[in-house]
Amino acid sequence: MSNMLEKARKYETEKIAATDPQTKPLFHVSAPTGWINDPNGFSFYDGQIHLFYQYHPYNREWGPMHWGHSVTCDMIQWEQLPAALAPDEEYDKAGCFSGSAIEADGKHVLVYTGVTRIKQPDGSEQDRQNQCIAFGLSLIHI
């Protein structure tokens, strides 16, 4: 696991412990902390329904996208799992954007858009999107 993903998971744990459960919705997925947007990777794996989503754990405003992760068996009660992806590689250091999830050869596989920023000759920056894949129990990048 990368340092950035480990840092995000530690931050989530701290924020969950400090959050009054009564402030969280009963029947909807919500991020443990920070900003949440685009749902991704809605999938069935290992007997559970998984929902991944883009989110920025460190602020309630848009920022470098991570992928949050929740599971359910009944589509009513959702369990928050640790972050699945963090922008921690050269090919996704500006964010882990939209993607999908499948089961392949018994593994949960995430395919997502990694974003990098490329400096242009005039000094401006341009986003470059890359197709990325993560797989396995801890969703290790390849």
Regions found by a protein language model. Give the residues of each.
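Short, ordered coil/turn segments that flank beta-strands lining enzyme active or ligand-binding pockets
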Residues: 45-47, 73-76
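Short loop/turn motifs at secondary-structure junctions and domain boundaries
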Residues: 33-34, 60-63
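Hydrophobic core segments of beta-strands in well-ordered, beta-rich domains
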Residues: 38-58, 81-83, 98-124, 130-135
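Blade-loop segments of beta-propeller domains
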Residues: 62-69, 75-104
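Residues embedded in well-ordered secondary-structure elements
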Residues: 18, 31, 58, 90-91, ...
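Beta-propeller blade signature
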Residues: 68-72, 129-138
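Conserved small/polar residues in nucleotide/adenosyl-binding loops
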Residues: 140-142
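N-terminal regions that are enriched for targeting/export leaders
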Residues: 1-50, 55
